[in-house]
Amino acid sequence: MATSANEMKRNDAREPGHAPPPSPGVLPALDTDVLSNDAFAFWKLPEKWREALGSAIVRSRKEAEWYLFESYRPSSSGRQPRKIRAYYAIKPFIPTALRQRMRSLAVRACSVPSFPAWPCESALLELWSEWLEGALATLGQSDLWHIGFWPDGRNCCLVLTHDVEGPLGLERMEAMADVEEKFGFRSVWNIPLDQYPVDWHMVERVRARGFEFGAHGLRHDGCLFRSLKDFTELAPRLESLAREHQMRGFRSPSTLRNIDWLCTLNFDFDSTMADSDPFEPQPGGSCSIFPFFLNQRMVELPYTLPQDHTLTNLLRRDPLPVWMAKVEWIAKRGGMILTLTHPDYTGDAANLHKYAELLKRLNDLEFAWRALPSEVAAWWHKRAALQLVEGRDGPSVSGGDADRVVVKRVSAEPMMRGKFSCSES
């Protein structure tokens, strides 16, 4: 398949300011320890076509991981940028209200980068869809079977996540969980494991109701990814406390990250990365509204809705219109709607009604798969292990448990219909 034609098409069609697709000289080397993030594995096409698409498959993985692993960002020695280290050095001495005011002024004074675009970045979606169009042309086919992205043929996926920043957020957790239960949802609560006293009896009460808990690092002090020395010293305690409290998922405090180091942590899934978030201390994003693999074990579940704190406290915007524009954009493309809210902020009376309104509207999404992060990670592993075989009697699935697996035509996928533009910015 001639990928150069697709690259030319992508360059010609891209809006001004967007990052160009990766060129061969900057593509990351393939890591054989990573379960494949190539286009063939993404679409899960019939195995009989793999050989004919061989070189295009390899190329697609390199291109995809250029986005997924943020290879478009300037390389560094591994140390945090100086401004992040300086911020965390003075953070304890600045009152919270003043700190948020200063961050809000700084964020609103800066222009939003054109890539990754916010709140919607379509570069990777374009790569997936254009690769498939090229594959169809190479194979002389007008349509192909594939393993559907979500269980039971669901149209999209819906995941609720929270980061519990402090004791106030912990106090508000049960009331916020009540609101979610009212609409038939369950969520995950990520807790810093060495920052403040945690009422583990309350945690177990909420867990018994079907909610999950994850590790939100040790402290909000910027230390975990500050340097390799810090990471090497802190990671064992983080993993030990997470095991003690039966936490198999992770999100880094303030979404600070070094992807190479992150991949060494002993968790089943991570949700540190966004698809696009220019407002975090470490801006960027994976450009993905679907899960992907960090290595053989760990699945990345990028958060795909803007954070409540970002919209309400920093940008001073009504979150609901931005949330719903992004929800509609993701749902129309069959992706994963993954929220990131904080009971510390959204759990108060002034904001909880807006969160309830979000849940009410999410409840109206037709044929969406409501799942906990652990369920999505398990599903993505299961789907990756399966193979699609075409025989005289039609397509069939082999290689593992096919329960809840639905085989569909790629032409039926929302991603293959319509444009990728987003109405809210």
Tell me the role of every PLM-derived stretch.
Residues G210-H220, F267-G284, F293:
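Acidic, His- and aromatic-enriched active-site or binding-groove loops in soluble protein domains
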Residues H201-M202, F225-T232, W261-C263:
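Metal-dependent catalytic neighborhoods of phosphoester/phosphodiester hydrolases
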Residues A215, S252, T339-T341:
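Conserved beta-strand positions
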Residues I191-D199, R248-N258, D275-S276:
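Short, solvent-exposed turn/loop segments enriched in Gly/Ser/Thr/Pro and often Arg
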Residues F231-A242:
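An active-site-proximal "capping" alpha-helix that borders the catalytic cofactor pocket
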Residues M1-N190, Q195-V198, R243-E244, C263-N266, ...:
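Terminal accessory/targeting
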